Regions:
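C-terminal functional regions that serve as terminal interaction/effector modules
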Residues: 44-47, 52-194
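Intrinsically disordered, low-complexity linker/loop segments enriched in Gly/Pro
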Residues: 1-37, 41-51
Length: 194
């Protein structure tokens, strides 16, 4: 698996984001997009993005093939492209509720092989808060340039990683974790205990 490193637009890897969203949009209700004021929120099953609306044409429109939704309108992936979703959940509240920002998260250079089923495997990047490991799929991790983002999370349960652009805090990504194995938990305790 070759990880893309094509970072543009405030540290976002636009090609990786578009590729991921196109794959998720193949599922009905796989991708939701809403606009609230000058911000656009994009939510999938495993990631969420908050971007300034001015970035929508460059980052999201090639996936949705639609203009940016009007303020308060949500569009959703459907059988034949994206359509307006009536009675949509409030994506802004969902984003805010799942954006842990209690503690700084350390991103490590370590990758963990993870089974994905059907004799396949994938890679996860090891993040940690103290001795608490957080594994994030490398596909999600490759969507942002680690030099241009700060990471936050919490040690309660399996914390998502909340990446915030250092140059523009209105740009952020939430990445859901993978449950670490007992081996990873032991290793993390040994490596990062003080």
């Amino acid at each position: 698996m070759k990880l893309s490193t094509n970072f543009t637009l405030f540290g976002l890897n636009v090609k990786a984001i578009q590729s991921y969203l196109k794959e998720q949009a193949k599922d009905r209700r796989g991708v939701r997009v809403t606009r609230r004021g000058d911000l656009v929120y994009i939510i999938t099953a495993y990631t969420a993005f908050k971007l300034p609306a001015v970035l929508y044409p460059d980052v999201i429109q090639p996936v949705t093939l639609r203009e940016c939704p009007a303020d308060g309108v949500t569009i959703i992936s459907a059988q034949y492209g994206f359509e307006v979703e009536d009675n949509a959940p409030d994506l802004v509240d969902i984003f805010k509720n799942h954006a842990p920002n209690e503690k700084p998260v350390e991103r490590t250079p370590f990758l963990q092989d993870i089974p994905t089923g059907k004799k396949k495997s994938g890679l996860a990047r090891l993040f940690h808060i103290g001795t608490t490991p957080i594994l994030i799929n490398t596909d999600y991790d490759s969507m942002v340039n680690p030099v241009q983002f700060t990471y936050h999370g919490t040690t309660r349960g399996y914390s998502p990683v909340y990446a915030i652009s250092a140059s523009d805090p209105t740009i952020s990504v939430i990445m859901l974790p993978i449950k670490p194995t007992a081996e990873v938990e032991v290793l993390c305790k040994k490596m990062f205990s003080e």
